[in-house]
């Protein structure tokens, strides 16, 4: 079974191999470009978000800085706003509906690690998709964990 198949099934996996490192580097470079745009470069930011995200609806704005692992696993609906310091650890899909607002310092992590220390030290992790439905507001410093709907 491939790493990607293990990821999609919620099984334990390591995130090395099968081109995964290169995909994360690609995302980091695009996010770096986004985070270093000037405040008036809103058109450039919109272009970059379309490159970073798997799906990008209309009227999306993310205050820099923000961070993502892959970007392509994040699917955002229309009228989305995220304040400063959004972190999305998108080893697997994150679905964000329409009219969603996210306050500062929010982490969305569909990826977790085993609680058993002997298993955890092997470097394995698991991922379960996260879905944030329409018209949701997420308060400051919230942490969204694997499998949340």
Task: Identify the residue ranges that each predicted region occupies.
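Flexible, glycine/small-residue-enriched loop-and-beta-strand segment within the central core
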Residues: 66-76, 81-149
């Amino acid at each position: 079974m491939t790493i990607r198949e293990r990821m999609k099934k919620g099984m334990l996996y390591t995130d090395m191999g099968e081109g995964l490192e290169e995909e994360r580097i690609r995302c980091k470079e695009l996010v770096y470009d986004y985070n270093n745009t000037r405040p008036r470069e809103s058109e450039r930011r919109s272009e970059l978000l379309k490159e970073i995200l798997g799906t990008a609806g209309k009227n999306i704005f993310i205050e820099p800085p923000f961070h993502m692992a892959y970007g392509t696993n994040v699917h955002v609906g229309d009228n989305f706003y995220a304040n400063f310091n959004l972190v999305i650890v998108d080893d697997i899909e994150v679905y964000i509906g329409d009219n969603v607002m996210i306050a500062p310092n929010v982490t969305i992590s569909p990826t977790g690690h085993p609680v058993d220390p002997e298993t955890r030290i092997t470097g394995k992790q698991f991922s379960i998709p996260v879905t944030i439905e329409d018209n949701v507001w997420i308060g400051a410093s919230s942490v969204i964990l694997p499998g949340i709907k």
